[in-house]
Amino acid sequence: MQKQIIEILKEIRPEFEFEGVENFFDEGMLDSFDLMTLVSTLDERFSIKIDGTDILPENFANVESIEALVQRSKKR
């Protein structure tokens, strides 16, 4: 799943390498518009619905936190 998430991130911001980054927002790699695009794309690609209450920077800080969010959303 991490590979798929990285591919999605690169579609949104192809100029960055996302592997091994601790916090995409602290590094200036993603902004709030990118976050909304990411949520929409994750919903579509993984057939999930990310709750508005889950749209927090810490849930999208890095590949691992995004993967955990997707896994939680699949269980709902």
What do the PLM-derived regions correspond to, one by one?
Residues 1-17, 68-76:
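Thiotemplate assembly-line natural product biosynthesis machinery
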Residues 21-31, 54-62:
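Glycine-rich loop motifs involved in handling phospho/adenylate chemistry
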Residues 36:
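Conserved catalytic core of two-component sensor histidine kinases
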Residues 39:
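Aromatic/hydrophobic pocket-lining residues that form π-stacking "cages" and hydrophobic walls in ligand
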Residues 51-76:
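C-terminal structural segments of small proteins and small subunits
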